[in-house]
Amino acid sequence: LHLKDCFHGRTGYTMSLTDSPDPRKVMHFPKFNWPRVTNPSIKFPLNIDNLEEVIKLEKQSINEVKDFLSKHPDDVACMILEPIQGEGGDNHFRPEYFKQLKTLSLENDFLLIYDEVQTGIGITGKMWAHQHFCEPNCEINCKLHCESMEPDVISFGKKTQCCGIFAGNRLNEIENHVFKESSRINSTFGGNLVDMVRFTIYLELMEKDDLVYMASENGEYLLSCLSSLKNHNDDIITNVRGKGLFCAFDLPTPDHRDKLISNMEAEGAIILGCGHNSIRFRPHLNVLKEEIDQAMSMMQIALSKL
């Protein structure tokens, strides 16, 4: 099971999952017809009307999951999803949705997998994006709120220098799982010792310089800057959203988005699109407020030329 607008990779089985706005990434490869369910993403600001809409989408998505489970009770190995969809449009979800999925996974004996390749390693202001789903005042070992939404498996990559998965105790219900049986999963181009040593140094520097906290603090500043930018360009910018430095906004059309990217390049800035008409921000963890200010100045100039 997976969500519409997801992105889980461009090799092997993941191409049966990826639902990219760019069809070239998977169109020429054979794929399994695995079930894809409604993506109940939040439209910001989360006012009463938008909340009603997202609750309706959540019910639709959960019902689609339940319907497939009822028709194929023994065929579902897992459900995989991104805590925040990246390439699909920087789509955010409510914790209540993940909690329902966790309950279904326990009731129907399938694993819940969070793909944190893009959202992991601090950029959202927490080490892993799914940690935002805990109650604000939860303790580290909370078993009431946090464990009711935690995944069974997490995938990681990109900033970690090598890709992989780690898993919780529920995997031990499976005899001879991949952490017990050698070579069940293998890779010619997988991680190597140099990658792992380099990432170890990165982790040490992140802890030493408190970069996850910095991403949280400067992320709030970036989001406030984007909200201010929207206020000055209310006819163009909508749906400002973000956690930590993982921020985005929407433009009226794909053409507006592509033109803005081109304008930003002319100003000397590299910026990425996502979804069909969104702009996403992915600063480095130690970005400074002064650099964010510079980016906003460039963005205002680029917007004025649309």
PLM features per residue range, with description:
Residues 1-306:
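Conserved N-terminal phosphate-binding loop of PLP-dependent enzymes in the Aspartate aminotransferase
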